């Protein structure tokens, strides 16, 4: 005898609801944006009923505000803005999608979608560009204030390593050359001609580096 597989009991209000997009933006000067589509996804193994509610239902027309979604399917919900006036610019309205099992009345989950009417897409893009520019300038100013003093300190003169190498090269050139008999300097400090040429070459490079800074 096969045991019937029982579906786990779902807690009211805890079921995740998948809707795209989560924000609707209508532009007054672009009539093509006055109609937008919400897509409700059902990734579950059971059918869902849905219902669309709105905080300002007089401003919108919701096509198929209630219906059902088959398991692992999706449904498109068309929303039209029917009150495009300047007094509504910038006002944030909210849609709430509630879902439940077909055999139940209690709402298993809900999702809110915000809707905003703006005067123009171009103005919106301009505002976003200005915002990005201000953020970029702020970041640049912060970078300059944070790092410029350090850079100036570094570039104000030669490094200690450069000075040390220069002193070593000068000292090497002042040491006696191999073969000099009349010298008070110990023999192991006598340098060959090739060694002195290398020291002179390095000293020249160091001098050029110091002059460039």
UniProtKB/Swiss-Prot annotation:
This is Motile sperm domain-containing protein 1. Its main location: endoplasmic reticulum. Changing residue 63 to I: In a breast cancer sample; somatic mutation. Disulfide bonds: none annotated. One of its GO terms (biological process) is positive regulation of transcription by RNA polymerase II. GO terms for cellular component: cytoplasm; endoplasmic reticulum membrane; Golgi membrane; nucleus; perinuclear region of cytoplasm. Residues 16-143 form the MSP domain. It is a multi-pass membrane protein. The gene is MOSPD1. Plays a role in differentiation and/or proliferation of mesenchymal stem cells. Proposed to be involved in epithelial-to-mesenchymal transition (EMT). However, another study suggests that it is not required for EMT or stem cell self-renewal and acts during later stages of differentiation. The chain crosses the membrane at residues 159-179, 191-211. It is found in: Endoplasmic reticulum membrane; Golgi apparatus membrane. Coiled coil: none annotated.
């Amino acid at each position: 005898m096969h045991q019937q597989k029982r579906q786990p009991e779902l807690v009211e209000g805890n079921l995740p609801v998948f809707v795209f997009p989560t924000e609707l933006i209508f532009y007054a000067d672009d009539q093509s944006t006055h109609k937008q589509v919400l897509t409700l996804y059902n990734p579950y193994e059971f059918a869902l009923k849905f219902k669309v509610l709105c905080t300002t239902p007089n401003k919108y027309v919701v096509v198929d505000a209630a219906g059902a979604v088959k398991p692992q399917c999706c449904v498109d919900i068309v929303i039209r803005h029917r009150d495009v006036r300047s007094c509504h610019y910038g006002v944030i309205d909210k849609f709430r999608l509630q879902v439940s099992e077909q055999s139940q009345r209690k709402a298993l989950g809900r999702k809110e979608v915000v809707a905003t009417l703006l005067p123009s897409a171009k103005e919106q893009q301009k505002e976003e560009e200005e915002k990005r520019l201000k953020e970029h300038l702020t970041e640049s100013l912060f970078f300059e204030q944070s790092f410029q003093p350090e850079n100036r300190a570094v570039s104000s003169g030669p490094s200690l390593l450069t000075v040390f190498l220069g002193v070593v090269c000068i000292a090497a050139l002042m040491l006696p050359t191999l073969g000099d008999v009349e010298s008070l300097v110990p023999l192991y400090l006598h340098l060959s001609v090739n060694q002195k040429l290398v020291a002179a070459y390095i000293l020249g490079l160091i001098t050029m580096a110091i002059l460039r800074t």
